[in-house]
Each structure stands twice: as structure tokens, then as C-alpha cells.
Amino acid sequence: DIVYGGGRITATIPTPGIHMVMHSLCAAAVGLTLGIEPELIKQGIESYAPVEGRMQIIKTQRLTLLDDSFNANPTSMAAAINIACRASGRTVLILGDMLELGEKGAEYHRNMGKKAVECGADIMIGKGPLMKNACEETERAGIETMHFDTSEDIMRALDNCLRDGDTVLVKASHGTNLKDVAEYIKANF
């Protein structure tokens, strides 16, 4: 519910994440300030649909894929990990490098490994030199961990890794090409 001076808007946000609640509240505040009818604000919030590769929730025959492969930064990756860990089934994280982070890149990636441990991920699959830092954290904590240099190697490993009922997050900067992995999962699981 969005409560404002003149009333209440009850709307359901069709995508997960506290950050989406914040975005919806901001949009509603702007709309109300501009005099947009509350019913139109409700319709706008409830008709939201993510674009390809931006936290698309895809139910395949065997599992749930969270395709967030288009881009990544430390804040968006932490939010995506939280969403994945709250879903049903085993949590499988397929995370690629977050690019253009400068001197703190290794630290930011280590923090993603710690986040995966904190939220109780079951499997961590990393891609890229920076994501090795996250994989070291998850492996140290006893989480089943794999690291690969190519998307093709990840795809080969998935056949022996994924199970019915899993929730699989695919998240990375666009330049790591994890979109190919998301497409493989859609087509084969």
C-alpha cells in the first residue's frame, strides 16, 4: 500500500526485490506530485515488465531461472543474490565478473562471495578472473563451488549440476557474455 495525504493506492509489484518497492514508491510520489490519477499510478506499477536480461523470472520445465545477465554492479548483484536465496529449491548462483570497478574490484567480488555464504546459497559457479575472489569465499565456507573461464565450460558443467526445482540466478556485467548461459538453461532445462 502507498499511503499519501489524500488516500491510499494498493498495488502489487510484479517483480521481486526491496529495490523494486523503492522504485515504485518514487514513481508514485512523482506521479502524485504531477497530479496523475492514483488508478493510473496503480496500473503503471502493476504493468511493469523487465526487459530481457534484467531480472526476468522464467519458469522452465525443471527449474526457475532468474535471468539478470544484462549488467551488474555490487548493489544490483547483492540484491539479486538476496532474491535468489529467498526462492524455493536449491539456490544456484552463476555469477560473472562485474566490470569497470577499478582498484576495489577484487574486494567487491569477495564481498559477493560473502553475500552468497550469508544468504545460504547451495552452489556457486563463477566466471572470470575477478569472480575467483568470490569463489574463494564460498569454497572456504563449504559451499559447492566451481570456477570457469568460458561460458561453454559452465554449460557443460550444468548438465551434472542442476536439478529439478532449483532456483538459478545468472548475473554478470554484459561484457562477460553470461547471456549465453541463460539461453542454454532456457533451452535445455
What are these regions (language model features)?
Residues 6, 10, 16-189:
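ATP-dependent carboxylate-amine ligase
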Residues 2-4:
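Internal nucleotide-binding/catalytic subdomain
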